[in-house]
Amino acid sequence: YYYRRGCLMAIPKFDEIIEYAGKHANTKINVTTNGALLTEKKAKTMLDAGVNVFDISLDAYHDETYEKIRVKGDLKKYRQNVLNLIDVIKKGKYNAKLVVSYVEQPFNSNETDLFEKFWNEAGADFVVVRKLHSAAGAKSNVKNKMELALKDVVRKPCLYPWERLVLTPEGDLGFCPAGWTGESHFIKFKDTTIKKAWQSNFMNDLRKAHLDNNYDCFGFCEQCPDWAHTKWPDEHGANYSDMMSEIVPSDLQ
């Protein structure tokens, strides 16, 4: 899981990175973007390079709602970019799936059904509605509301330490995709491998802390309420791994 703060496609030489990954990674490639830079030319370049999944965050049905959530964003343009992508995938008969996602929040909660209906009918393979999270506690207003709602709820382990690692453009490996300010970074990728980092004492200690509900050594996790929005396989509602295993099952067996 490679990420940057902002749109992934804005990374310099992004096309070259994707082409290299397609040739050498021997795994499935998922590109997450807001659709702003997703021209037909770029879409075809990525599809030809072997991108398997596009996960596009749009967050609104109405243009005026989008402008409130994504200031200076142009939903009309970005929506058309996604519709063009659907057309390119179909006409080129590419083996690629499209996920359109939506973070439900006060500005858009009255148009969730419209959003789901539109994109299901438009040809998206999955339409995902996510809960608004606190960016691992960084968004204090969201964090405070979540903590109030969770005050009588028994805490469960967060799924993320068992689900993924994140790799930043700066070469840091972290354990939390919700954390945007770097507190989950624990090692430089140049000093390890994904396998070694995943099986490291640090990650095993982190998992044990979540299982024991004892965060003495992991204050970043202790203060974060976003565990409540992660879904384990036996819970109601699909999690990210469930969706990806359906989209690209051969990669997860």
Residues covered by each model-derived region:
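C-terminal accessory region of radical SAM enzymes
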Residues: 87-97, 121-156, 172-232
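Radical SAM/AdoMet-radical enzyme domain recognition
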Residues: 1-3, 7-120, 125-130
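Short cysteine/histidine-rich metal-coordination sites, predominantly Zn2+-binding motifs
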Residues: 236-248
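Short, small/polar residue-rich loop motifs at catalytic or cofactor-binding pockets
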Residues: 159-161
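Short Fe-S-cluster ligation motifs
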Residues: 1-4, 204-213, 248-253
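Short catalytic/ligand-binding loop motif for oxyanion handling, primarily in non-cytosolic enzymes
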Residues: 9-11, 39, 62-65, 107-112, ...
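Short, acidic, Ser/Thr-enriched surface-loop or helix-capping motifs
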Residues: 167-170
